[in-house]
A protein has these predicted regions:
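N-terminal "domain-start" segment that seeds a small globular fold
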Residues: 19-47
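Short active-site neighborhood of thiol/selenol oxidoreductases, capturing the structured segment around
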Residues: 47-68, 177
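Loop/turn elements at helix/coil->beta-strand transitions in domains of secreted/extracellular proteins
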Residues: 52-54, 83-88, 114-119, 137
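Short, thiol/selenol-centered motifs that function as redox-active sites or metal-ligating centers
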Residues: 61-70, 140, 196-199
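Structural microenvironment flanking redox-active thiols in thiol-disulfide oxidoreductases
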Residues: 68-113, 124-130
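Short, internal strand/loop/helix patches
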Residues: 108-148, 152
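Thiol-/selenol-based redox modules, centered on thioredoxin-like
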Residues: 142-200
């Protein structure tokens, strides 16, 4: 009887244990291409960038204070790396019914105010961010173009200080992209994304 009780307890524990396996891409996975509407009305895909060595995919938005704090740094990444073959592609993943401040019109206004030089796309049906496994804004994925397709090489935060760019000690994205451009290994492939939860 005691054995049966113990088994029941174990089965119940397993049945109700949280699923800790992260969904989405991991390091080394090949990212699927997408086709999303840009703020200029055109659709953008990774395959549009025939000569790209890789991509800096940024899930971001207008309404999250963390995302706003990183806007200038995201623009700086594009200015530094787009010409070297690693353009920034920003994707707004939030449900606009939940966050009207992230509507396409609001995205267009914000991009103009900030002078964004990168595509700012809307994940209108919220189908792309789950593929990546993004949970925050901002959430970064550095991809490297290979014969297999765009391979995920870094996932996480842009750097180690969202509050003050002048106090940043480690620039995770820059370190990853620089290493990929130079064909050398780098240590930090994953960090914790700091930001607001993506709104459903």
């Amino acid at each position: 009887m005691k054995t049966i009780f113990t088994l029941l307890v174990l089965l119940t524990t397993v049945a109700f244990a949280p699923n800790t396996k992260e969904k989405g891409y991991d390091i080394g996975d090949v990212a699927t291409d997408f086709k999303l509407k840009n703020i200029d009305g055109n659709s953008v895909s990774l395959s549009d960038y025939k000569d790209a060595k890789g991509f800096i995919i940024v899930f971001t938005c207008n309404t999250c204070p963390y995302a706003v704090a990183y806007e200038d740094r995201i623009e700086a990444l594009n200015k530094k790396y787009a010409a070297k073959g690693f353009p920034v592609i920003a994707i707004m993943p939030n449900n606009v019914k939940t966050k009207p401040g992230d509507s396409m019109k609001a995205m267009q206004i914000r991009a103009k105010e900030k002078g964004f030089t990168f595509p700012y796309l809307m994940d209108a049906d919220q189908s792309i961010y789950p593929q990546y496994g993004a949970t925050k804004t901002p959430h970064i994925y550095v991809l490297e173009s290979t014969d297999r397709g765009p391979v995920v090489e870094y996932i996480g935060a842009i750097d180690d200080n969202y509050k003050d760019a002048s106090l940043v000690k480690t620039k995770y994205v820059e370190n990853a992209v620089d290493a990929l451009l130079n064909g050398v290994a780098f240590e930090v492939h994953k960090t914790k994304a700091i930001g607001c939860s993506i709104k459903l």
